[in-house]
């Protein structure tokens, strides 16, 4: 079966920069995935994702069912465009390409988009169905989390 692409978008009640800073944080990843997926390599981690880094470890469904060893490579983190791209794989999943895009709507609101392209061979359809549920729940959690986000005063290095 060919790869499938799923796109989900939601508007968040928080400034784009605050949401973007949270996207770059493993803490937000843990918050929006809690109860659905557990990924021990990010438990307790407080430093931001780094472009080019790979995080690998066992993925747990609903926090209790061991799935497979999952690999996440942070392929690109573009702070100016507020875009994060990860290339992931593990178990039945040959490729899980995930883009997160944050776009300002005004000074107090932003648009958050998850776009994922999944190739899991014969299992692409059921894996994509799971992804639909996963991102629906994650975005509902982003909507609850967004109004609680605080501004960060982190200075980010700019390449060049």
Role assignments for model-derived ranges:
Residues 13-17, 75-82, 101-111:
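A short, structured loop/turn motif at beta-sheet edges
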Residues 117-160:
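A conserved amphipathic terminal alpha-helix motif
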Residues 12-14, 61-63, 92, 118-120:
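Beta-strand elements of well-folded, non-transmembrane domains
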Residues 3-11, 54, 69, 81-83, ...:
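Intrinsic-disorder/low-complexity, polar/charged segments enriched in Ser/Thr/Lys/Arg/Asp/Glu/Gln
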Residues 30-31, 40-89:
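Glycine-rich portal/gate segments that line the openings of hydrophobic small-molecule binding cavities
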Residues 1-50:
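Hydrophobic ligand-binding cavity/cleft-lining segments
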Residues 85-133:
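Beta-strand/loop substructures that line and gate deep hydrophobic ligand-binding cavities in soluble
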Residues 8-10, 69-76, 88-89, 97-104:
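Hydrophobic/aromatic beta-strand elements that line small-molecule binding cavities or substrate pockets
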């Amino acid at each position: 079966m060919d790869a499938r692409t799923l796109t989900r978008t939601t508007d968040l009640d928080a400034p784009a920069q605050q949401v973007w800073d949270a996207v770059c944080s493993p803490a937000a990843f843990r918050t929006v995935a809690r109860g659905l997926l557990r990924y021990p390599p990010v438990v307790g981690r407080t430093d931001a994702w780094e472009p080019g880094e790979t995080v690998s470890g066992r993925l747990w469904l609903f926090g209790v069912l061991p799935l497979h060893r999952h690999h996440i490579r942070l392929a690109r983190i573009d702070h100016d465009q507020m875009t994060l791209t990860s290339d992931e794989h593990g178990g039945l999943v040959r490729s899980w390409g995930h883009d997160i895009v944050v776009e300002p709507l005004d000074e107090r609101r932003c648009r958050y988009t998850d776009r994922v392209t999944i190739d899991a061979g014969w299992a692409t359809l059921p894996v994509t169905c799971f992804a639909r549920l996963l991102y629906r729940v994650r975005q509902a959690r982003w909507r609850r989390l967004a109004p609680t986000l605080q501004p960060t005063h982190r200075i980010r290095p700019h390449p060049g």
